[in-house]
A protein has these predicted regions:
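Extracytoplasmic substrate-binding proteins
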Residues: 1-27, 32, 36
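Structured segments of extracytoplasmic/periplasmic soluble domains
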Residues: 3, 32-36, 60-64, 86-90, ...
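Short beta-strand elements at the ligand-binding edges of bilobed clamshell
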Residues: 12-13, 44, 115-126
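Hinge/cleft segment of the Venus flytrap/periplasmic-binding protein
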Residues: 13-21, 32-33, 124-170
Length: 170
């Protein structure tokens, strides 16, 4: 996308309005793309973190923008998977005609990447719970915790999805 001549038209499927993940994911994305004026969010609407709403909103985006859409940024994988259905039903090829970026790194996203329908999923690991419980046990045992506990997460482009898929815990 960086080497593309002209504007890069982005449509955004936001999470549930007012939720911390939706706010943070929008803010973080906008901070990154503002560094290059050719990246333009042409449409942005809530998909409520659901597959059905993601499909419905993407259908509306496609009716309004059609082939002008270069990138779909979805705040979660479920909305992206719904949007993929809408893109296919519109006769387009997801991950080819429209670059698709989503967040969570769930099993369905890996399946979509392996099928060549999703370009990249940015992991948001649900495995924070076990780390939290371990920290609670350590506190109860009188141990000192590190100042910061980091949950390992990754960025998974479609090219590595098949290799990484067997290692997924969720």
């Amino acid at each position: 996308m960086k080497d593309q001549k002209g504007d890069v038209n982005i449509v955004e499927l936001q999470g549930t309005v007012g939720s911390a993940p939706a706010i943070d994911r929008k803010k973080g994305f906008e901070e990154i793309i503002k560094a290059d004026p050719k990246f333009k969010i042409t449409r942005s609407q809530t998909g409520d973190f659901t597959r059905a709403k993601g499909k419905e909103v993407m259908e509306a985006f496609l009716k309004a923008e059609g082939k002008k859409i270069n990138v779909l940024y979805a705040h979660n994988d479920d909305m992206a998977i719904g949007a993929i259905q809408a893109i296919e039903e519109a006769g387009m090829k997801p991950a080819k005609d429209i670059t698709i970026i989503s967040i969570d790194g769930v099993k369905g996203a890996f399946e979509a990447m392996i099928a060549g329908k999703l370009n990249v999923s940015v992991e948001c690991s649900p495995l924070l719970g076990p780390q939290l419980m371990s920290a609670v046990k350590d506190i109860k045992a009188g141990k000192t915790l590190p100042k910061r506990i980091v949950t390992e997460e990754g960025i998974f482009p479609m090219e590595v999805a098949a290799k990484e898929f067997p290692n997924r815990k969720y």
